[in-house]
């Protein structure tokens, strides 16, 4: 009787163990953004919604390399505080990126300063570790191309995204809730950092929402100013579709949001649903090797924002994405 009872119990135990996800040791590069606290809290203590615990099961942040930006004061001043906070969550501090990659299986490249991403990424790619790069992917379009090309050559899963991409209403439209999108308008904060392309620093959030619902196919960009003095960027997509990003104004465009018009109706887009929605996609990529955002779409998004800067330099003239991409590739050819 005892054996009859024990054998089924043993079988159930073995099945349960087989279904448990493989443990993954995560490492963080750059402790100069609040995102590291949000991600580490969700992975090491549990997501905000306990029902989502299975989406992060088996993944823990075990080590971090603190150095992020070297000269952006708003970033550098955060490092000591955030270092202590992640240590309190059980994270060990590594002496270098090279040291970090030896301790972990997967990487969050979180340095707020996009200019140092390529440098910090190289040891990660050399070690073959899957990596998520927080926005912006780089400080320039040329470096964005270098990063995407290097990951492809190394055959390492890599993607970059704002959490805004995975907001519920934005994803619904992306997945066809209003049919093919004919036009969309999004807004978000767009504070500037002189060392970066204007929209790379913060406007990328609203621009990412725009590309999530519009998809690829943007051909040209014109930059202007709203009636209340804020940034306005209008993109023309193939097939006569139009996408517009505007800087939020704290009034009728407050925070994050927007609207998409499709073949079968319209819907709100661009809302902020927290960091966990992005984190869950990162974990899926770490486990499957399948990226949720293609390199092509990411490159077009950053070309759109670079073209907006070029349009600004030309007094609001129309600038094609093909032009800024060619310029960036020429820069790479001159300085590989």
Regions from the language model: what does each represent?
Residues 20, 107-108, 288-336:
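C-terminal helix-rich "cap/oligomerization" subdomain common to oxidoreductases
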Residues 3, 19-127, 152-153, 314, ...:
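N-terminal glycine-/serine-/threonine-rich beta1-alpha1-beta2 phosphate-ribose binding loop
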Residues 128-130, 135-136:
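Short helix/strand-capping hinge loops at secondary-structure junctions
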Residues 185-253, 296-303:
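Rossmann-like dinucleotide-binding domain that binds NAD(P)(H)
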Residues 9-18:
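Hydrophobic h-region of N-terminal signal peptides that target proteins for export
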Residues 95, 133, 158-160:
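Hydrophobic residues in well-ordered beta-strands that form the structural core
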Residues 1-8:
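Sec-dependent signal peptide recognition
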Residues 137-196:
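A contiguous active-site-proximal alpha/beta segment in oxidoreductase catalytic domains
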